[in-house]
């Protein structure tokens, strides 16, 4: 998925508003995904999936860090997330549809916390970005 210059500007703008809340939003995204799409819990059988658990917060921090890394390298998302792509494809074997679920839940979290920032244009750009991240994370699946 090709991001236009406007898309890149919009995505960077949203992430500048997220700022120091990225880890919190990552955990909130996971909690929302586990509730809205309970089948995603199967990849985390060893986690305490209760609200506010340390494990969800820690994994939310990883999710947020990956998204920030992708934003910081928006012109080379594949290069920035190559190791993460290998991990998900070869070791974790996460069903690719789950990245769409995660992206949707992240959009909802952004909309809740920054409704004014999520104009239709920004929404479209952020959706394209999250789809691009998902495509990178599933590119090495066979």
From Swiss-Prot:
Signal peptide: none annotated. GO terms for molecular function: haptoglobin binding; heme binding; iron ion binding; organic acid binding; oxygen binding; oxygen carrier activity; peroxidase activity. Keywords: Heme, Iron, Metal-binding, Oxygen transport, Transport. One of its GO terms (biological process) is hydrogen peroxide catabolic process. GO terms for cellular component: blood microparticle; haptoglobin-hemoglobin complex; hemoglobin complex. It comes from the Eukaryota. O2 binds at residue 59. Residues 2-142 form the Globin domain. Heme b binds at residue 88. Red blood cells. Heterotetramer of two alpha chains and two beta chains. Belongs to the globin family. Involved in oxygen transport from the lung to the various peripheral tissues. This is Hemoglobin subunit alpha-A. It comes from Mareca penelope. The gene is HBAA.
């Amino acid at each position: 998925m090709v991001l236009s210059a406007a898309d890149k500007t919009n995505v960077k703008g949203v992430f500048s508003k997220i700022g120091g809340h990225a880890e919190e939003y990552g955990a909130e995204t996971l909690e929302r995904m586990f509730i809205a799409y309970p089948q995603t819990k199967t990849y985390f059988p060893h986690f305490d999936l209760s609200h506010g658990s340390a494990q969800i917060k820690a994994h939310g921090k990883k999710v947020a860090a990956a998204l920030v890394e992708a934003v910081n390298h928006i012109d080379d998302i594949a290069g920035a997330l190559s190791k993460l792509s290998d991990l998900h494809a070869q070791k974790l074997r996460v069903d690719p549809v789950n990245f769409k679920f995660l992206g949707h839940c992240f959009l909802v979290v952004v909309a809740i916390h920054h409704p004014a920032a999520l104009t239709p244009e920004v929404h479209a750009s952020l959706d394209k970005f999250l789809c691009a991240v998902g495509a990178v994370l599933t590119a090495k699946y066979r």
